[in-house]
């Protein structure tokens, strides 16, 4: 049986602290290396607009700041504690006007 894995924010906090405008840092935590059925990670974003094509369903949890997802010309806004489900095969855009941290 595989044991639980702990991920510490302190291990990647320096990446958020050094993020410049227009920057993003993605830290995949769950990948095919440690799971056959799921993916997930942390994404630090700062004043960005990033187009993205989803190849799998995605749940997004906004931990800090404000996050906007654009899909088919419609804006979906998240604040701290908000979540959304985004179905696969959508062409989306991650957007932030300031700093934001999401978990996907």
Residue ranges and their predicted role:
Residues 52, 69, 102-104:
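Short hydrophobic/aromatic-rich beta-strand segments that constitute the beta-sheet cores
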Residues 54, 61, 78-80, 96:
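Conserved strand-loop elements at the edges of beta-sheets that form or border functional pockets
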Residues 1-42:
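A short, N-terminal "cap"/entry segment at the start of jelly-roll beta-barrel domains
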Residues 88-104:
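Ligand-binding loop in jelly-roll beta-barrel domains
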């Amino acid at each position: 049986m595989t044991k639980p894995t702990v991920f510490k924010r302190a291990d990647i906090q320096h990446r958020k602290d050094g993020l410049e405008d227009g920057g993003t840092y993605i830290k995949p935590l769950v990948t095919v290396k440690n799971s056959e059925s799921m993916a997930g990670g942390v994404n630090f974003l700062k004043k960005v607009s990033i187009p993205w094509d989803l190849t799998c369903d995605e749940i997004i949890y906004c931990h800090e700041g404000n996050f906007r997802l654009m899909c088919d010309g419609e804006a979906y806004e998240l604040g701290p504690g908000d979540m959304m489900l985004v179905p696969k095969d959508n062409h989306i855009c991650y957007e932030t006007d300031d700093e934001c941290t999401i978990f996907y």
